[in-house]
Curated annotation (Swiss-Prot):
Residues 58-91 are annotated as: Disordered. Its main location: plastid. It comes from Oryza sativa subsp. japonica. It is found in: Plastid, Chloroplast stroma. Keywords: Chloroplast, Plastid, Transit peptide. Coiled coil: none annotated. Plays an essential role in early steps of chloroplast development. Involved in the regulation of plastid gene expression. Required for the proper function of the plastid transcriptional machinery and protein accumulation in thylakoid membranes. May function as molecular chaperone to ensure proper organization of the nucleoids in chloroplasts. This is Thioredoxin-like fold domain-containing protein MRL7L homolog, chloroplastic.
């Protein structure tokens, strides 16, 4: 009985030991497998993040953005911000391309001459038309008022005529002594004497009171009856030029812009446009508010200033005004 119990106890011990050994081995194996599985999952996660990061960089490069490096989480410098390309929307990109195409369409396409013989012929043609060097005694030199071949100063400016007078012996002696003669060059500047000169408020006193001779004042307005104002100025110009054609002295004539010089117009007591004031010796002798022809105004000037016959357009009371010309200083 005791042996049986011992055997039974001895038989139960190995079973218990084996069970304990197997349990210990299983626990150790599980502890060894878990770190490896965790490490494997960590590696797979890193690979997945690497693939996602690479895909985002490619997408950013395609869209025009700047791919961010792995260690670029820190603050970037101002230089890097300046180098960053400008991000544009699709609408802005289409607008920019359309403007570029419009600018390119404005420039006409020119065909380039590639044939050497044709290029040489074209060069010879240009040299023939526009010579680089011309002899002073060339019989074909143009005698008209031109600056070179084919370009005239009259296209851009009024003609300038300069007349050089011959010097006398006395003038040459003065030049030798260092005294310059006043008659070396005579300017024929009739082309620069305008029949009507525009005057401003700041120049009014010098224009009127420096010379008390005959003066005609045209007060015009570019916005009120513009056609009549322009016609009045044209007829006055023709009237003054008629004096010049007969080598007669013409009265001075100035124009006042009502839009630019309202204070002067108010001082002259002008309300309707155009209006022509005939002044003499600092007094307004007549106000004419009618747009007349050049011939009628010529006769009026001759009557007021040169004691000519009275024209039919004037009454006996006209020309007797004593209103003083205003002073603007």
């Amino acid at each position: 009985m005791a042996l049986q119990s011992c055997c039974s106890s001895s038989a139960s011990v190995p079973a218990t030991c084996s069970a304990l050994c197997l349990a210990e081995a299983t626990r150790a194996a599980s502890l060894f497998v878990r770190p490896r599985a965790a490490a494997r999952r960590l590696v797979l996660a890193r690979c997945a993040r690497g693939r996602e990061g690479g895909e985002s960089k490619a997408v950013q490069l395609v869209l025009g953005g700047r791919a961010r490096d792995d260690g670029s989480e820190s603050e970037s410098s101002d230089d890097e911000d300046d180098d960053e390309p400008m991000q544009m929307t699709d609408e802005q990109r289409r607008t920019l391309r359309r403007k570029i195409r419009e600018m390119m369409d404005r420039v006409p396409e020119t065909a380039e001459i590639t044939d050497p013989a044709e290029r040489k012929a074209k060069m010879l043609e240009l040299l023939t038309k526009y010579q680089l060097v011309v002899e002073e005694e060339d019989p074909n030199w143009p005698e008209d008022d031109e600056d070179g071949h084919g370009f005239s100063l009259g296209q851009f400016f009024d003609k300038i005529t300069i007349k050089a007078e011959k010097k006398n012996d006395d003038d040459e002696e003065d030049d030798a002594k260092g005294n310059q003669s006043d008659k070396e060059i005579v300017w024929e500047d009739d082309n620069y004497i305008k029949p009507i000169r525009d005057v401003k408020t700041m120049d009014w006193d010098d224009t009127v009171f420096t010379d008390f001779g005959p003066l005609i004042v045209l007060v015009h307005n570019r916005y009120k009856r513009p056609q009549d104002n322009e016609n009045a100025r044209d007829q006055l110009v023709k009237a003054i030029e008629m004096f010049w054609e007969y080598n007669l002295p013409s009265p001075r004539c100035v124009a006042v812009d009502a839009c630019a010089e309202p204070d002067l117009v108010k001082a002259l007591n002008v309300s309707g446009f155009p209006e022509v004031l005939f002044t003499n010796a600092g007094k307004i002798v007549h106000r004419d508010k009618v747009v007349r022809s050049a011939e009628e105004w010529t006769r009026m000037m001759a009557f007021f200033y040169y004691k000519a016959a009275r024209p039919p357009c004037l009454s006996e009371a006209d020309g007797q005004g004593q209103e003083k010309v205003p002073l603007m200083s």
